[in-house]
Curated annotation (Swiss-Prot):
Subcellular location: Secreted
Organism of provenance: Atractaspis engaddensis
Tissues expressing the protein: Expressed by the venom gland.
Any one GO BP annotation for this protein: regulation of vasoconstriction
Family to which this protein belongs: Belongs to the endothelin/sarafotoxin family.
Keywords linked to the UniProt accession: Cardiotoxin, Disulfide bond, G-protein coupled receptor impairing toxin, Secreted, Toxin, Vasoactive, Vasoconstrictor
Protein name: Sarafotoxin-D
Any GO molecular function: toxin activity
Function: Vasoconstrictor activity. These toxins cause cardiac arrest probably as a result of coronary vasospasm. May act by displaying agonistic activities towards endothelin-1 and -2 receptors (EDNRA and EDNRB).
UniProt cross-references to Pfam families, sorted A to Z: Endothelin
Amino acid sequence: CTCKDMTDKECLYFCHQDIIW
């Protein structure tokens, strides 16, 4: 996925959730 702000942990968290599932 792509997060506009790579320091946005909430964005990254959901990104990784999407990758895991």
